[in-house]
């Protein structure tokens, strides 16, 4: 019985619900409520809800962004990672910024290291679909170590993963300058050029770093190709080769055949959690092309980026903000301007984790969300930042588009010119004034907040199982 109480308390700490709380401000000025104290009746209720939620998820679970990124995937991954043996990244690179908080409210901004790194019992995997900037990865690893989090022995990187070099960043900037007035709005982290090297078959994979001579030859060829293509290209390839000799020694303990590792983990009954980067509406094939990322954040990219078969996935969680945001250029049907946009941006602190750029703000777009669900087949939804909508008199949800020809559609257009001209058809719902940042159970949410979540659930046809009500790890409501 004592053991059971300890398990309940431990699960409750992941999702909140305590007899006492203390509040502090994080380094961005946001209020973070931190749970403390002994298990209470409320905590037990939360713990039991979390146990039921865990039981539904199964051995292989993917957490994917369903909008334009920045939905809060890292927080859910960090929470769920306590129940999983393996936490894996499958695609993207350092253009994907994930912000997570530990039990003390300390913030960690991660770009390449999987969000499950705070779980001491989990092995973090960087899969073959990720493009890896090794100096940047080691910066993150070193910062984590300074904060008392040691990634050594707990993180492996695929020998098939392609390397992203500083020359790719240089190319990214030169390419953006070439586009002039038609800029994509790239993060200039070199992601697109790195994937281009992969596609044109002159990329360098992590496993190549083990052969010093071959690595040098491949990097020289890559630099020569870039110099021939871009007039203003500047890159000291010989200095980079010397630099990577030291990096090669340091990365060696992390290199592994992750395809074999993750499949053996699955076959032995271990639980695997996949952390998606970017989001479906930025998918190279399904997103608002060409205003997209250079990889496939949808479910297909998960399978390709890890070498894990589709039939092995039981749970696919789509993460969506209670409103929407977007960074960079591209069509955005529910975009808001003026006072409402400014208010939501400040309340939600909507600035890019990777770029620091102010995010564009919009109402929740169910046409886009249902499109993402169509592609991924979500089994559950995680609605995040519901607390940001507090204090609003009324809320709007985009439920359809009115096309330039006057017809109304609930399908997401592929044509960008059409998408830029659509008029959004909205439903209006009543808002709520209560502060919900300390709410930890469904029953304690204001009625109008419940109605909002239930309407999203109804429109999506998918259960909104997890509801984020604040930035802290404990600020999560599980819908019974």
Curated annotation (Swiss-Prot):
Pfam families: Adenylsucc_synt (PF00709). SMART domains: Adenylsucc_synt. Pathway: Purine metabolism; AMP biosynthesis via de novo pathway; AMP from IMP: step 1/2. GO terms for cellular component: chloroplast. The keyword S-adenosyl-L-methionine does not apply. Its EC number is 6.3.4.4. It is found in: Plastid, Chloroplast. GO terms for biological process: 'de novo' AMP biosynthetic process; IMP metabolic process. IMP binds at residues 70-73, 95-98, 187, 201, 278, 293, 357. GTP binds at residues 69-75, 97-99, 359, 385-387, 468-470. The active site is at 70 (proton acceptor), 98 (proton donor). Substrate binds at residues 353-359. InterPro entries: Adenylosuccin_syn_GTP-bd, Adenylosuccin_syn_Lys_AS, Adenylosuccinate_synth_dom1, Adenylosuccinate_synth_dom2, Adenylosuccinate_synth_dom3, Adenylosuccinate_synthetase, P-loop_NTPase. Its cofactor is Mg(2+). Its main location: plastid. Binds 1 Mg(2+) ion per subunit. Belongs to the adenylosuccinate synthetase family. Plays an important role in the de novo pathway and in the salvage pathway of purine nucleotide biosynthesis. Catalyzes the first committed step in the biosynthesis of AMP from IMP. This is Adenylosuccinate synthetase, chloroplastic.
